[in-house]
């Protein structure tokens, strides 16, 4: 069986989650917006229970969570939804990083075409944006800072909790794309972050569900305007019939992950140590700051090896990736590794390993390393 080391792209749905989803699809299948019968009442109550739990995982209030189809939609609502407020108040400056997911970069490029000024900060070889570099760019007209929690290609953790404290009390709003970090580093997201994007399928929930947390500042709501129209659901910020089975799947997945997080972290770190020990027999370089990375994502380049050729060679052994699944059809160098200042030869050949410990029992790092050694040309 091919070992799966691509959980940064998506995870297997936990069987307990699948059972919950099936229940809400086939038994309690009511519309949460139906108020005239018990099917709808049960669905609405269940959604509110899920909302309360998710809010608690990031230290938010129940009413501050809206359900979406995933982190891409959450990012778009957060970024494009802030634009009218920025225009009205002559605050058209936004700060972000050049290593963000395309679901952040592309909405911001769109805002540039509408007259917004966006600073895309580059992190350097560490892959980590310094808090000071963000603060140095702040201006009186800065509307928003948007920074990912964990980079999806390198696994490098960004200093979002520290930055949130620095931005507290300023008029600048702070958005965090937590698609890769939610559940793994729970304390970071309890910092005073105005908006948090969450993805379900990165923690064992089905694809097609996520959330956007929009915290109040005192009594004031985050000044978001809807980017879609057609109903009053989710505070009118995300109209449409609620996908109750998927929401309940996200709820169950978040509970399961929260309960198992300490063990998951220990086992993920143990797997990382096994990987690094085996790869030590090859000639390789870690891309990104290994001291500020999540334990389950590792991005490396092997000297003299083409990453695509290696993937083809080991396709019957292990499933790995060269970068983000959302851009894997593109043959351009990784925009993340390029923004870190790595040359095209490295940026073209970064290989990302990402794992959940429970899903890699069949993977032998030593066997993989032996394949790499056989493929690598002799050292000059």
Spell out what each predicted region is.
Residues 1-380:
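Pyridoxal 5′-phosphate
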